[in-house]
Amino acid sequence: VKVFIGISKNRSEYKGTDIMLRAAKHIKEKHPERMELYVVEGVPFNEYVMLMNSSDIIMDQLYSYTPAMNALQAMSQGLICMGGGEEENYEILNEKELRPIINVQPTYESVCKQLEYIVLHPELIPSLKKDGIEYIKKHHDHIKVAKKYEALYNKLLDKS
């Protein structure tokens, strides 16, 4: 299982990257034959994306309830997001079926538990990747989002 974590020096603690990295290193040490860990810091964006896209899982935004832009881009490319994927995220979107995000609580123990589980059950990866792509198409397609904004703006203009 190929796991990717991008480090933003000045925002590591803010994003929870410090905890996620420590947990990832622990699971890599525990299961070296089952997991590859890509830690990327301070590289040009094109290189960052290339390295990210060669992975199975991106670890991002430990303290968030929802995936951020980095995770959404990764999911659109078929990566699995491990990070914020609380039920409130799905409720806001009225999503009843798809659960592509491996949700973790903001603790070292939770990250270790979820990461070890997926490392020991790689057979789950293809369906999570497929669900992630479907989730992006369904809820984050740029045309659909633009049409929702257009409808909102038109509704607001009609009220004035």
PLM regions: where:
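Conserved donor-binding/catalytic core segment of Leloir-type glycosyltransferases
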Residues: 1-15, 21
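Active-site donor-sugar recognition loop in glycosyltransferases
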Residues: 47, 62-67, 88
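Short alpha-helical segment that forms part of, or immediately flanks, the ligand-binding pocket
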Residues: 49, 71-76, 90-91
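Acidic donor-binding loop of glycosyltransferase active sites
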Residues: 53-66, 79
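Short hydrophobic beta-strand element within catalytic cores of glycosyltransferases
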Residues: 80-87
